[in-house]
């Protein structure tokens, strides 16, 4: 009888766990009370990441170059019961980077997580035709500003005993997208930046990892998929024969920023449907 009772209790507990997992009741929050900054987070991949980090318990500060985008996103995510605030931030401007960090510190006491997602691409064509102005803009925002944004949060992370930086690169770093040469080059640079920062920041208990999304269906990438013939050609190169969704990137970012990934640093994870991804 005693054994039967123990078995019944075990079955009951197992069923309770399954039911909680399927309904979302008491969902585990691996980022509980962490403070996360996500740049370029009012649309596409950045928005999906911001939402997931908040769902996993983080206090998230979103940002965009336009106030109306920030206001809309904050209202939407707060309406979902998430702890989200936001501010305007052009990552290429020092005063904007400082304001973003200051908001997190003033509202939540510090910074634990940085997701560096901001990027630009003002050029489509042969790489040899890209002007010096194009190169300067792309490298300034996509690479230099990523370094400076990281530099801005490191002192705050140190005060809290460490942190996690997640840099968003692209599968174009490995397998160049056609007609996006300067953009591809900037994203390849981020792979090296991730490795260097990981080595230098490890003694401060700050981990640095990288996400390389493949062809994800966003407004930013529409030049690659709006044309039906090009879209089908791109899909043929994938093992998983579909375009990715922003949400496909969000879970892995949350994992890399959590304690579950505490022994992972300097790595790049490709979310690309099987796209070739080796330098």
From Swiss-Prot:
Family matches, as InterPro entries: NAD(P)-bd_dom_sf (IPR036291), Sc_DH/Rdtase_CS (IPR020904), SDR_fam (IPR002347)
Tissue: Detected in heart, kidney, liver and small intestine. Detected at lower levels in brain, lung, stomach and spleen.
Keyword terms, alphabetized: Acetylation, NADP, Oxidoreductase, Peroxisome, Phosphoprotein
Residues the record marks as site: Responsible for the stereoselective reduction of 3-ketosteroids into 3alpha-hydroxysteroids and benzil into S-benzoin: 177, 180
Gene Ontology biological process terms in this record: ketone metabolic process; retinal metabolic process; retinoid metabolic process; steroid metabolic process
Peroxisomal targeting signal (motif): residue ranges: 277-279
Superkingdom, natural source: Eukaryota
Activity regulation information from UniProt: Inhibited by kaempferol, quercetin, genistein and myristic acid.
Keyword Ubl conjugation recorded: no
UniProt miscellaneous comment: Primate DHRS4s display different stereoselectivity and catalytic efficiency in the oxidoreduction of some substrates as compared to other mammal DHRS4s due to a difference in conserved amino acid residues.
Protein name: Dehydrogenase/reductase SDR family member 4
Organism encoding this protein: Sus scrofa (Pig)
